[in-house]
UniProtKB/Swiss-Prot annotation:
GO terms for cellular component: cytosol; glycine cleavage complex. It catalyses: N(6)-[(R)-S(8)-aminomethyldihydrolipoyl]-L-lysyl-[protein] + (6S)-5,6,7,8-tetrahydrofolate = N(6)-[(R)-dihydrolipoyl]-L-lysyl-[protein] + (6R)-5,10-methylene-5,6,7,8-tetrahydrofolate + NH4(+). GO terms for molecular function: aminomethyltransferase activity; transaminase activity. This is Aminomethyltransferase. Pfam families: GCV_T, GCV_T_C. Belongs to the GcvT family. It comes from the Bacteria. The gene is gcvT. Its EC number is 2.1.2.10. GO terms for biological process: glycine decarboxylation via glycine cleavage system. The glycine cleavage system catalyzes the degradation of glycine. The keyword Transferase applies. The lineage of its organism: Bacteria, Pseudomonadati, Pseudomonadota, Gammaproteobacteria, Legionellales. It comes from Legionella pneumophila subsp. pneumophila (strain Philadelphia 1 / ATCC 33152 / DSM 7513). Keywords: Aminotransferase, Transferase.
Length: 360
């Protein structure tokens, strides 16, 4: 039986087409995935992301623990209310998950993880926390909305209480704030500005309806996927997993090597991979002829082993097919993609296609 978020009946009332997403009954779209995509790029859209896993790490040992657990270094967080994106790796350097960690206080960190990896992630974090002065709380009583787009913050501010408005108005990118049991973060998964809002379950329906009345468009998983693909944001389980490392996933920037004595989990394996030479990289592909690139298709590179499409789709913004692919380091400026037995040329570029609504 699939799990349901507190907004399930609200989604049905809004005309959502529901699908099973890793055991959750979630909206795919509300009639037009294309319109929802454009709403986020040009105005404001909202997503129910209450299926995500929220874990609070409490106690004086929180920072010390996270410096061991994550590839990125929370010592870069210089004050409360800051956020950091990171990978969480196993001892072999394989990516267990990617996540955002928020410092709410010196002894209070919030981690938001992917839903598909909930059970494994929580078990891993709990096991690795032994010996540290921390306690873990999985916050299933909370719901989460992502409000994204160039007008997302303005429309959200128009429906918030004055105390919330004052706090949210001062947030900059990758900052967060708690106000009256509501949590606001200026983060997202679309390549647009916006907020991710975490509230007690009993408040989320009213928040959704207020945003709807303010002109924010309900959006489903379909638009979320094309938006994040255009922005070059990876999807765990598809673009990377425990068989891949940050260094071959375009995520080397999330690995902080200094100080060497930090010794985060997987550091030894990643240092070894770096020294021996990274053999694969993540690139962006733009198809040069008709067709749609999809996950799992082969990428043919002259003189090299085949690469693989990890994510591919039609880009509503660029009006052509785009993809993320893992290919040999020697890959040049053009490749061939095997689409149903036909070899279609594609241009190789950086794994990001759109920034703030504009082509990169």
């Amino acid at each position: 039986m699939t799990a349901k978020t507190p907004l399930h009946t609200t989604h049905l009332a809004c005309g959502a087409k529901m699908v099973d997403f890793h055991g959750w009954d979630m909206p795919l779209h509300y009639g037009s995935q294309l319109n929802e995509h454009h709403a986020v790029r040009n105005d404001a859209g909202m997503f129910d992301v209450s299926h995500m896993t929220i874990v609070d790490i409490l106690g004086a040992g929180g920072r010390q623990f996270l410096r061991k657990l994550l590839t990125n270094d929370v010592d870069q967080i210089t004050h409360n209310g800051k956020a950091l994106y990171s990978c969480m790796c196993n001892e072999h350097g394989g990516i267990i998950d990617d996540l955002i960690v928020y410092q709410r206080a010196s002894d209070n960190y919030r981690v938001v993880l992917n839903s598909a990896t909930r059970q494994n992630d929580v078990a891993w974090i709990r096991a690795k926390s032994e010996g540290f002065a921390v306690g873990l709380q999985e916050r299933r009583e909370l719901s989460m909305l992502a409000v994204q787009g160039p007008n997302a913050i303005a429309k959200t501010l128009s429906i918030l209480a004055p105390a919330h408005v004052d706090a949210v108005s001062t947030l900059t990118s990758f900052e967060c704030v708690d106000v009256d049991h509501w949590f606001f973060a200026r983060t997202g998964y679309t390549g647009e500005d916006g907020l991710e809002i975490i509230v007690p379950n009993e408040f989320v329906t009213q928040l959704w309806n207020d945003l709807l009345h303010a002109g924010v468009t309900p959006c489903g998983l379909g638009a979320r996927d094309t938006l994040r693909l255009e922005a070059g944001m990876l999807l765990y389980g598809q673009d990377m997993d425990e068989t891949t490392t940050p260094l071959e996933s375009g995520l080397a920037w999330t690995v902080k090597w200094e100080p060497e004595d930090r010794g985060f989990i997987g550091m030894g394996a990643l240092v070894s991979q770096k020294q021996q030479g990274i053999k694969r990289k993540m690139v962006g592909l733009t198809l040069l002829d008709k067709g749609i690139m999809r996950h799992g298709q082969k990428v043919i590179i002259e003189g090299c082993p085949d690469g693989i499409i990890t994510s591919g789709s039609y880009s509503p913004t660029l009006q052509q097919s785009i993809a993320l692919a893992r290919v040999p380091m020697e890959t040049g400026e053009q490749v061939l993609v095997d689409i149903r037995g036909k070899l279609i040329p594609a241009k190789v570029g950086k794994p990001r296609f759109i920034k703030q609504g504009k082509p990169v």
